[in-house]
Amino acid sequence: VNSFRLSVLFRKCASPSLSPLQIEQKVCQEIFLGKIASEESLANLIVLKGGIVLDGLSKGQRGHTQDIDFDFKRWRLSDNGLTRFIQKLNLAPAYPGISLAISAIRDLRQRNYKGKELTLAFSDSHDSFTLKIDIGVYRSLSGLVSYQMTPSEIPSCPLWRIGNEQMLVEKLSSFVVHGSHNTRVKDLFDAAWIIMNLKISHQQFRSAFGRILKEFGIFEPSEKIAKRLVLLLGQKEFIQNFVLLYKGWEPYGPLESAEIVSAFLKVAFHL
């Protein structure tokens, strides 16, 4: 049981590239996903998305992600529903002696998204760490992919994550919505990594692209939007802003990432 103390897990996750706060977040992520994966009924409740999936798929190459994003497949997103979900999580067999409690709940409202941000406290008898979790509700159960966590000493069930095509569209949607004002630098690097490292069906990508943009209230033809996106990524002044924010550990630099995404869009939409 001592091996499941927060302080022991902190030392296990420690890395020169991570700050103490980032190590705590990584420990909490490991505990949260471990508890979910240790109980099949829990594993079937959620669909993982965002940076935590890319961090796992890239075996840490993507860099640190500070939270966890997921959608409920079938669970109420009310405050009462969230409390019951955390209670259920505390009954999971993984990480005995470490309990989770909700410190705060905040509504998340964006252009095409309504969800909740939970601040969770992870505690044992000696220490307490904090992690933020963003939760939405998954609209379609098609295109899900089984996701096996990295091997650990704890037996685990496969989790579910969004498909590669939807993941890529979500990374590109910030550029479609915000255009040259987009400041989500990491989305460009993530999109390039997905294209270069994961299998993408052009047909499924086009379908997901049109569907998700409609959720944003954008009803123009997908080809027209894709062409505009290619033009945006070809603007040197726009990409230059990304160069200034480039941290150096992403697998592809800003210019190369923009070229990778543009080339993919041209092929996918026959531009």
Could you describe each region identified by the protein language model?
Residues 1-46, 56-271:
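Structured mid-to-C-terminal alpha-helical surface segments
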Residues 48-52:
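Glycine-rich beta-strand-to-loop/alpha-helix junction loops that act as flexible
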